[in-house]
Amino acid sequence: MKRLIVVFGAVGCAIALACFSERGSGPVAGPAECRVPVSVIDSLHFIVAIRNFAFHPDSIAVPAGATVTWVNCEDVGQEPHTTTSDSAGVWGSADLTSGDRFSHTFATPGKFPYHCIPHQTFMRAKLVVQ
């Protein structure tokens, strides 16, 4: 009887640990942009990775006519992010979940600070179109 109680107790503890432990899903396996630290595809296509609640790189200069693509490289299940110009109407993405991407082509030179709406107090970056 004692042995049976010990076995059931051990099984119960194992089940409880499995149910309540926090397990990450690991890195995003999908987009190649998340696996390789690439920010320039060619002279008119640039990648900004969203990882660890930050934009990488956090400052980028591109020529007029370039397309910038933001890719959410956070683990599956993390909070969504946006990429939104500080100046209203320049650009703004919908919520980007893990693996999602948003692209915008910049025709006009200028300085464009931007942020993530849900995390705008700390998740900020700058884009310069030359």
Question: What function would you assign to each model-found segment?
Answer:
Residues 1-18:
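Sec-dependent bacterial lipoprotein signal peptides
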Residues 19-130:
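Extracytoplasmic copper-binding redox domains, predominantly the cupredoxin/blue-copper superfamily
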